[in-house]
């Protein structure tokens, strides 16, 4: 369960670790009801990142709520917030933009963590 406090603390630690590097976050909101209730809090917490990719909401067997999408978080953010429903596109984008020293985080309670190995592989190929 990711709430805004946990996100903020994690991103503060990532910022310290990154030093002069960037913090790139891939966030997958968990449940439509939580996204509806906490969209602004998520946006504020995620602002500690230099670049934020928002995947589609991980429903976790919850029914869709009309009008509630990850774009609520993106719209409350700024130009650093990017809605990207395609996991393949996120991997390609992060792998093409990341530089040595950047910290890349996957956050969420869904299948977002499955992206980490693909990102590592893509970066390994790029910087080989």
Show which residues each predicted segment covers.
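ATP-dependent carboxylate-amine ligase
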Residues: 2-128
């Amino acid at each position: 369960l990711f709430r805004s406090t946990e996100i903020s603390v994690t991103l503060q630690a990532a910022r310290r670790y990154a030093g002069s590097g960037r913090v790139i976050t891939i966030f997958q909101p968990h449940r439509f009801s939580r996204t509806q209730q906490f969209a602004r809090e998520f946006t504020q917490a995620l602002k500690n990142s230099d670049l934020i990719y928002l995947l589609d909401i991980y429903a976790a067997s919850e029914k869709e709520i009309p009008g509630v999408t990850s774009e609520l978080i993106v719209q409350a953010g700024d130009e650093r917030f990017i809605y990207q429903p395609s996991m393949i596109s996120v991997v390609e984008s992060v792998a093409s933009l990341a530089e040595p020293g950047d910290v890349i985080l996957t956050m969420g309670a869904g299948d977002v963590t499955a992206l980490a190995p693909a990102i590592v592989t893509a970066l390994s190929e790029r910087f080989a």
